[in-house]
């Protein structure tokens, strides 16, 4: 199955190079030169994932993400920020607004492809699990309540970040991150981070918190 991606980048040379690389990897890729053009394309066509720069004319990446999240049919499209804005505060802002991943330029194209495949796989599993939930029994994951901080940490754990990296992004101590991860393991009745990630994806936990 070939997935449809949108690349939002006002640097035409860079956007063309990324597009060609992703096409070689088997993806369909459309290019938008700014956030406004991207928003119009998203309303017109179906995309499985959007890769967006942040600093752009007319509408920047943050504004684009905000607009997407306000429309039901577009709200769940995974968005990756691919940008030179690599400061911790910028990453925190992006994650708090609902971006699914963050890569700083210059980046390894193989890492971008791995992130894309991981997010599409996660989204595909979430969709499949939604269709299977027909039982009258209330599973554990439907009874779970996660605090905003637990939600933030769970998202970053699923993205593959280490406790140290999470601590930097959330401006907290590694010890605090360890405590939150331990609490997540207890709440989900899982033994380690790998099982926690599998449980969260399998049970569509991200869409329930």
Curated annotation (Swiss-Prot):
Entry GO CC: chloroplast
Principal location class: plastid
Domain named Response regulatory: residues: 4-120
UniProt protein name: Probable transcriptional regulator ycf29
InterPro entries on file: Bact_response_regulator, CheY-like_superfamily, Sig_transdc_resp-reg_C-effctor, Sig_transdc_resp-reg_receiver, Tscrpt_reg_LuxR_C, WH-like_DNA-bd_sf
Domain of life where this protein originates: Eukaryota
Domain HTH luxR-type: 139-204
SUPFAM superfamilies: C-terminal effector domain of the bipartite response regulators, CheY-like
Location of this chain's protein in the cell: Plastid, Chloroplast
GO BP: any one term: regulation of DNA-templated transcription
Gene Ontology molecular functions: DNA binding
Positions bearing 4-aspartylphosphate: 53
Keywords: Chloroplast, DNA-binding, Phosphoprotein, Plastid, Transcription, Transcription regulation, Two-component regulatory system
Pfam families: GerE, Response_reg
